[in-house]
Amino acid sequence: MIPVLIVDDHSDIRRLLSITLGKEFEVLEAEDAASALDAVRRHHPKIILLDVMMPGKMNGLQMLEAIKTNPQTQDILVAMISARGQVADHDDARRRGADAYFVKPFSPLQVAAWVRSKVE
């Protein structure tokens, strides 16, 4: 199964996406950037679904930049998930290397369709 990493500090969001994707993908979960980066090193997921605003030393945009500037991880597809839906937020994420941007509340089926389209 293809590994997909869900990174969000809200367990209900992780659970919703995990249930939606769990039958087709190996779902990995992390609640912050530190544990997510550890999961990236250990499992090298094909796709990361990454919350923008997270607690800790690194937010989602900083983690995105770390992934996309590292030659060992730059090929991982990253979709940002955020409550911030302004055009400037989308543009900032794209400039840092985001492959997609979903605004909360999002449709888990839409996210799953995007994930499927990237691995087929």
Feature map (PLM): residue ranges:
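Short amphipathic alpha-helix used as the core "switch/output" element in two-component signaling
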Residues: 38, 61-74
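Helix N-cap/capping motif at the beta->alpha junctions
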Residues: 29-38, 59-60
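Alpha4 helix (beta4-alpha4-beta5 surface) of REC/receiver domains from two-component response regulators
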Residues: 58, 62, 85-102, 113
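C-terminal output helix
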Residues: 106-115
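Two-component/phosphorelay signaling modules centered on CheY-like receiver
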Residues: 11-28
